[in-house]
Amino acid sequence: MKRLLVLTLLGFSLSSYAQKVLSGTFELPAEEKYLTLDWDCTQTIFDKKYTEKEWHAIKGDDWPNAKKQVIEGIVRDMNDKLGKSRIIAVLPGSELQGAYTLYICPQKLDRKGNNKSIYILKDAQGNEIGRAEFAGDGGHWGTFANLMGDGYEKAGSKLGALITKYNKMKK
Protein backbone atom coordinates (compact mmCIF):
# COMPACT_ATOMS: atom_id res chain seq x y z
CA MET A 1 0.00 0.00 0.00
CA LYS A 2 2.84 2.37 0.86
CA ARG A 3 4.47 1.60 -2.47
CA LEU A 4 1.25 2.49 -4.33
CA LEU A 5 0.98 5.78 -2.44
CA VAL A 6 4.60 6.67 -3.22
CA LEU A 7 4.13 5.85 -6.91
CA THR A 8 0.95 7.93 -7.06
CA LEU A 9 2.65 10.93 -5.45
CA LEU A 10 5.62 10.54 -7.76
CA GLY A 11 3.30 10.48 -10.77
CA PHE A 12 1.55 13.67 -9.67
CA SER A 13 4.82 15.48 -9.01
CA LEU A 14 6.25 14.49 -12.39
CA SER A 15 3.11 15.50 -14.26
CA SER A 16 3.01 18.86 -12.51
CA TYR A 17 6.62 19.47 -13.56
CA ALA A 18 5.62 18.97 -17.17
CA GLN A 19 3.48 22.11 -17.12
CA LYS A 20 4.10 25.34 -15.30
CA VAL A 21 3.88 29.08 -15.68
CA LEU A 22 7.42 30.41 -15.53
CA SER A 23 6.65 34.14 -15.43
CA GLY A 24 3.99 36.75 -16.07
CA THR A 25 0.35 36.05 -16.81
CA PHE A 26 -1.78 34.62 -19.59
CA GLU A 27 -4.69 36.98 -18.96
CA LEU A 28 -5.62 39.01 -22.03
CA PRO A 29 -7.50 42.34 -22.05
CA ALA A 30 -11.30 41.99 -21.94
CA GLU A 31 -11.73 43.29 -25.50
CA GLU A 32 -9.26 40.76 -26.94
CA LYS A 33 -10.91 37.77 -28.60
CA TYR A 34 -8.23 36.18 -30.81
CA LEU A 35 -4.85 34.72 -29.94
CA THR A 36 -2.48 33.96 -32.81
CA LEU A 37 -0.11 30.99 -32.50
CA ASP A 38 3.26 30.86 -34.26
CA TRP A 39 6.62 29.09 -34.08
CA ASP A 40 9.72 30.83 -32.75
CA CYS A 41 12.82 28.70 -33.00
CA THR A 42 15.31 31.56 -32.78
CA GLN A 43 16.07 30.88 -29.12
CA THR A 44 16.78 27.20 -29.71
CA ILE A 45 18.93 24.97 -31.87
CA PHE A 46 15.75 23.16 -32.89
CA ASP A 47 15.38 24.50 -36.44
CA LYS A 48 19.06 24.19 -37.29
CA LYS A 49 19.38 20.69 -35.87
CA TYR A 50 16.21 19.17 -37.25
CA THR A 51 15.92 20.81 -40.65
CA GLU A 52 19.29 19.45 -41.67
CA LYS A 53 19.30 16.03 -40.02
CA GLU A 54 15.81 14.81 -39.24
CA TRP A 55 13.25 16.48 -41.48
CA HIS A 56 14.63 15.13 -44.75
CA ALA A 57 13.98 11.64 -43.43
CA ILE A 58 10.30 12.29 -42.64
CA LYS A 59 8.72 10.05 -45.29
CA GLY A 60 8.00 12.80 -47.80
CA ASP A 61 7.18 15.55 -45.30
CA ASP A 62 9.38 18.61 -45.05
CA TRP A 63 9.77 21.03 -42.17
CA PRO A 64 7.50 23.80 -43.52
CA ASN A 65 4.67 21.31 -44.06
CA ALA A 66 5.33 19.61 -40.71
CA LYS A 67 5.26 22.97 -38.90
CA LYS A 68 1.94 23.84 -40.55
CA GLN A 69 0.42 20.43 -39.79
CA VAL A 70 1.52 20.51 -36.16
CA ILE A 71 0.36 24.07 -35.45
CA GLU A 72 -3.07 23.27 -36.95
CA GLY A 73 -3.37 20.40 -34.46
CA ILE A 74 -2.32 22.63 -31.57
CA VAL A 75 -4.91 25.26 -32.52
CA ARG A 76 -7.64 22.60 -32.84
CA ASP A 77 -6.89 21.05 -29.43
CA MET A 78 -6.45 24.45 -27.77
CA ASN A 79 -9.83 25.60 -29.08
CA ASP A 80 -11.44 22.43 -27.71
CA LYS A 81 -10.23 23.48 -24.24
CA LEU A 82 -10.96 27.19 -24.80
CA GLY A 83 -14.71 26.53 -24.98
CA LYS A 84 -15.32 28.15 -21.57
CA SER A 85 -13.06 31.06 -22.44
CA ARG A 86 -13.68 34.19 -24.49
CA ILE A 87 -10.47 33.54 -26.47
CA ILE A 88 -10.20 31.77 -29.84
CA ALA A 89 -6.79 30.50 -31.00
CA VAL A 90 -6.05 31.26 -34.67
CA LEU A 91 -3.37 30.29 -37.17
CA PRO A 92 -0.76 32.79 -38.35
CA GLY A 93 -1.83 34.46 -41.58
CA SER A 94 -5.56 33.85 -41.07
CA GLU A 95 -8.11 36.62 -41.54
CA LEU A 96 -8.76 36.81 -37.81
CA GLN A 97 -5.65 38.07 -36.08
CA GLY A 98 -5.27 39.07 -32.49
CA ALA A 99 -3.05 41.75 -31.02
CA TYR A 100 -1.41 39.02 -28.94
CA THR A 101 0.72 36.16 -30.24
CA LEU A 102 1.66 32.96 -28.46
CA TYR A 103 5.05 31.74 -29.68
CA ILE A 104 5.97 28.06 -29.47
CA CYS A 105 9.69 27.72 -28.69
CA PRO A 106 10.70 24.03 -28.88
CA GLN A 107 13.28 22.95 -26.32
CA LYS A 108 13.37 19.14 -26.57
CA LEU A 109 11.98 16.65 -29.05
CA ASP A 110 12.74 12.97 -29.39
CA ARG A 111 12.04 10.49 -32.21
CA LYS A 112 8.74 9.41 -30.60
CA GLY A 113 7.42 12.99 -30.71
CA ASN A 114 7.73 13.57 -26.96
CA ASN A 115 8.43 17.26 -26.53
CA LYS A 116 8.98 20.10 -24.13
CA SER A 117 8.51 23.69 -25.24
CA ILE A 118 8.42 27.17 -23.82
CA TYR A 119 5.30 29.13 -24.79
CA ILE A 120 5.78 32.91 -24.78
CA LEU A 121 2.82 35.31 -24.91
CA LYS A 122 3.68 38.67 -26.51
CA ASP A 123 1.63 41.78 -27.24
CA ALA A 124 1.56 43.65 -30.57
CA GLN A 125 4.68 45.63 -29.60
CA GLY A 126 6.64 42.45 -28.87
CA ASN A 127 6.61 42.83 -25.09
CA GLU A 128 6.59 39.55 -23.22
CA ILE A 129 3.43 39.12 -21.13
CA GLY A 130 3.75 35.53 -19.97
CA ARG A 131 5.97 32.48 -20.27
CA ALA A 132 5.04 28.86 -19.59
CA GLU A 133 6.58 25.45 -20.11
CA PHE A 134 4.56 22.47 -21.32
CA ALA A 135 5.43 18.95 -22.34
CA GLY A 136 3.49 16.51 -24.48
CA ASP A 137 3.83 12.79 -25.05
CA GLY A 138 4.22 11.84 -28.70
CA GLY A 139 2.42 9.10 -30.57
CA HIS A 140 3.18 5.44 -31.17
CA TRP A 141 3.18 5.06 -34.95
CA GLY A 142 3.24 7.14 -38.12
CA THR A 143 5.66 9.60 -39.61
CA PHE A 144 7.86 11.72 -37.38
CA ALA A 145 5.61 14.71 -38.17
CA ASN A 146 2.56 12.74 -36.98
CA LEU A 147 4.33 11.63 -33.79
CA MET A 148 5.43 15.19 -33.14
CA GLY A 149 1.91 16.42 -33.87
CA ASP A 150 0.45 14.04 -31.28
CA GLY A 151 2.80 15.41 -28.63
CA TYR A 152 2.15 19.05 -29.45
CA GLU A 153 -1.62 18.52 -29.59
CA LYS A 154 -1.49 17.17 -26.02
CA ALA A 155 0.57 20.18 -24.94
CA GLY A 156 -1.88 22.48 -26.77
CA SER A 157 -4.76 20.96 -24.83
CA LYS A 158 -2.97 21.72 -21.54
CA LEU A 159 -2.19 25.23 -22.74
CA GLY A 160 -5.84 25.79 -23.69
CA ALA A 161 -6.85 24.82 -20.15
CA LEU A 162 -4.34 27.32 -18.73
CA ILE A 163 -5.57 30.16 -20.94
CA THR A 164 -9.18 29.31 -20.04
CA LYS A 165 -8.25 29.56 -16.36
CA TYR A 166 -6.96 33.10 -16.90
CA ASN A 167 -9.68 34.25 -19.34
CA LYS A 168 -13.02 32.80 -18.25
CA MET A 169 -16.14 34.36 -19.74
CA LYS A 170 -17.78 36.94 -17.52
CA LYS A 171 -21.46 36.29 -16.81
What is the role of each PLM region?
Residues 85-142, 146:
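Surface-exposed short loop/turn segments
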Residues 18-73, 165-171:
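A structural "domain/chain start" motif
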Residues 1-24:
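Bacterial Sec-dependent N-terminal signal peptides
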Residues 6-10, 27, 94, 109:
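Generic marker of residues within folded, mature protein domains
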Residues 19-28, 127-171:
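C-terminal/domain-edge helix-coil "capping" segments
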Residues 65-93:
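Mid-chain, structured segments of secreted extracytoplasmic proteins
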Residues 39-41, 79, 105-110:
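Generic secondary-structure microfeatures
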